[in-house]
Amino acid sequence: MPIDPVALTADLVRCPSVTPEEGGALDLIERILSGAGFDCTRVDRNGVPNLFARWGRKGANRTFGFNGHTDVVPVGDAAAWTRDPFGGEIADGWLWGRGATDMKSGVAAFVAAAVDFVQETPPDGAVVLTITGDEEGDAADGTVALLDWMAAEGEAMSVCLVGEPTCPERLGEMMKIGRRGSMTAFFTARGVQGHSAYPHRAKNPVAALARLIDRLSSHDLDRGTEHFDASTLAVTTFDTGNPATNVIPALCRATVNIRFNDAHSGASLTRWLEEEAARVTAETGVEIALSAKISGESFLTPPGELSELVARAVEAETGLRPEPSTSGGTSDARFVRAHCPVVEFGLVGKTMHQVDERVEVGQIEPLKAIYLRILKDYFA
């Protein structure tokens, strides 16, 4: 009997899988896949739950992979929700709950499509699912752990589809063929504390750091590249921790986040930030230290066989030709891209991470149909 992706989405939403808790979501998926003949392995690392499942022969020449996650962000104030965030309630044409959009519906749709596919038309090849419980957190022991385990065990994917929400307004209008890189820069300015009436006796870290931040935020990183929009820099914090209005503090901190395209790398941007900080230090005498965290480099799966496969299936099922895009935030595709070509396609993501997160019920079955067509066309 075909799996109902709507019912499965509701069941997954009822699993309270807030990172790093598994909440029963991976257990549910494992039971379904095992019952359909998939070889399932739990690849848990440092207490983080992950699931690897394969139908077909290990090392098959053609192995279609899927990547997704069942962990969700916290609900925030549960009293602010119209409905139980872990109720999986269907009302007014919507399925409500945390993770309904991001991305339990996408996981449910592919699980349903994969089970139907291997049972109805067993392919000459293999189908692999990599499902993590650590995408919304640090992501150090999620998809990365799965890929590390696969490499050690001789498991592979020829191509991979990530089921994250990709469509801004309508199902079918956008797929992701790459993502911008992301880095966060933490600045600490150390000056000399003093009385605000005698600024010449102090070294003001606030003024120095403000000068640096102004230069960074007014600098055009680039004008965009062939497949990417212009890189962006956003100031996200500026703190002194100083409650006194007549004291120049000794310390000031600021944070900026950069989303960068393929004109840059994390290393090149770090060098630029260090150079700018050194210039301001030389001008003001205030030491400015930098600590940079690079969450992921930019990447691109050039338009070609995989993106065309996805685009044809989407257009056949929705009538829309998806725009190949690299916009938005990061995803676990940034890890998969080192393993095999990867494209992302999923539902409309307007309510993800919000209070009253919900997915339009009428999108879930068509998403399953798209995924099923992708599988059939890939193995045709």
From Swiss-Prot:
Catalytic activity of the protein: N-succinyl-(2S,6S)-2,6-diaminopimelate + H2O = (2S,6S)-2,6-diaminopimelate + succinate
Q: Family assignment?
A: Belongs to the peptidase M20A family. DapE subfamily.
Q: List the disulfide bonds.
A: none
Q: Which cofactor does it need?
A: Zn(2+); Co(2+)
- For this protein, what does the record note about how its cofactor is bound? Binds 2 Zn(2+) or Co(2+) ions per subunit.
Q: What's this protein's function?
A: Catalyzes the hydrolysis of N-succinyl-L,L-diaminopimelic acid (SDAP), forming succinate and LL-2,6-diaminopimelate (DAP), an intermediate involved in the bacterial biosynthesis of lysine and meso-diaminopimelic acid, an essential component of bacterial cell walls.
What Enzyme Commission number does this protein have?
A: 3.5.1.18
Give the GO biological process terms.
diaminopimelate biosynthetic process; L-arginine biosynthetic process; lysine biosynthetic process via diaminopimelate
User: Do you know which PROSITE patterns this protein is assigned to?
Assistant: ARGE_DAPE_CPG2_2
What name is this protein filed under? Succinyl-diaminopimelate desuccinylase
In terms of SUPFAM superfamilies, this protein maps to: Bacterial exopeptidase dimerisation domain, Zn-dependent exopeptidases
GO MF annotations in UniProt: acetylornithine deacetylase activity; cobalt ion binding; succinyl-diaminopimelate desuccinylase activity; zinc ion binding
What residues does Zn(2+) 1 bind to?
Answer: 69, 102, 164
| Positions of the catalytic residues | 71, 135 (proton acceptor)
The superkingdom of the source organism is Bacteria
Q: In which pathway does it act?
A: Amino-acid biosynthesis; L-lysine biosynthesis via DAP pathway; LL-2,6-diaminopimelate from (S)-tetrahydrodipicolinate (succinylase route): step 3/3
Keywords, in A-Z order: Amino-acid biosynthesis, Cobalt, Diaminopimelate biosynthesis, Hydrolase, Lysine biosynthesis, Metal-binding, Zinc
Protein's organism: Cereibacter sphaeroides (strain KD131 / KCTC 12085) (Rhodobacter sphaeroides)
How does the annotation summarize its subunit structure? Homodimer.
Per UniProt, where does Zn(2+) 2 bind?
102, 136, 353
